[in-house]
């Protein structure tokens, strides 16, 4: 059954405007750098091609093909620019209707699967994060906007010939404590998590239509140790810690004493330690890192791991009314902080919108909000892998 045409959702492709859908889903998430869409409809274009002698007048719209550039607007507000990635169709037994579904990704989708610099260069000197990302994104027709401090230039930044565009940029961004996010329409954003507020709160008895929640300890730990090694006299800075000995007291963070004499050639082993007071039983974990000049300390990294693990340990999904909220009727968007009241999941405070899904179907318009703890996407200046290891890996 075809629902009445909704002028609120419009797909622009091949010089046509389509707004007659059975189902629409548009998704953006901090977990996936590019947004995606899925639309189901009666494919009048292919039906006309199949039954050309029987169809009159011409169909409402022509057939959509994979690879076509497209854009999607909600209430005439552009929210998605990208490409049709796949078209699937099914014809009924009587040959009277062809049901089709098209899916695709936004303009940043090609950054996930395509090479960063197929023809070189593979190494840059004294380049900023913004310049590096712009150099990679420019051939794809994608802009870059810095919305936060991107830090100092990299003295040397190298990638492998086979490195994909997005992983290469993310590796560099982590060294500057920056989060990469697609705006869905034109640009890759260099930003921080939760820098803006959502248009409204999320609350039972107010706008929530249901809930699913997860509160997990599976990847949370009572004690997080970060161990790294400074460069020694022999230039070794591979991040390999010296043999570990038991701490004097579990959970105290007491690190084994290091002998400057014995470690002189290989470097000094450094240990950071942070605790999560919400984890009430002994659950220790050790993370190994490189420690180099200019990067965060092992103690800062230990505290950061605890914050991120805590934020990702809470996950809630809320369908809410419509796509818009608040006095300005603004769209719900990812990477915004929102006040959340959910007595069922025992939440009463700020949460971060990890993802949004705009839906339109026989039940009308709604948004599914994916919320996580506000610290889930915190960033910290992570140390770079040594050039020595990088070069060995790319030989």
Regions found by a protein language model. Give the residues of each.
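Structural motif
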Residues: 13, 74-75, 204-206
